[in-house]
Amino acid sequence: MVRHVSKTPQIREVILSGGDPLMFDDASLELILSAFASIPHVEVLRIGSRVPAVLPMRITPNLCRILKRYRPLWFNTQFNHPAEITGDAARACNRIQEAGIPVSNQSVLLKGVNDSPDAMQDLLNGLQKISVRPYYLFHCEPALGCGHFRTDVRTGLKLMEKIRQGCSGLALPQYVADLPGQEGKVPLWPLSRPIQNALRKHQDFFDNFE
């Protein structure tokens, strides 16, 4: 993979993701990071990991020293329920942040777990409270064994409309679907009737703005 990236100058950003890259020991992880960081056209490294939420003791001072050496590095984690935001999890995120690495969150919309307005609002506000920015809310993919967790898109859109009223802009994620093939992540925007009416009311302003 390192060889492929080194021969593909169009690649400016490399993501280390699932499985979970933090399941490597420190030496192995640094070997991987240093290999990609040594490629001149790779400008940004990203890590995707559930570890801060489920194994926060893995975020050690030594690990953070390693991560700090490879900035600009962005860290995306995944909290799916407010109960996961424990004191240990918050401290783990804070250690990463103190190393100068931004921490964002990518949740998955899960039926019976976080698909109620109260649960989702508590999750998003809780993340903002520990300086973790809610970045994406993924519509649950049709993966094997996950069917019972899937909602329909309409449920997700209604949920986004409700939590928009109880969260600040910094706490609102993008609701996206990761489409198969090369389309990638597609934003799903809730346009409730009140919003549609408001847009129609001010249509002349937008149409004639210079």
Region locations from a protein language model:
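Conserved AdoMet/S-adenosylmethionine-binding subsite of the radical SAM
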Residues: M1-E13, G19-C167
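C-terminal accessory regions of radical SAM enzymes
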Residues: L157-E210
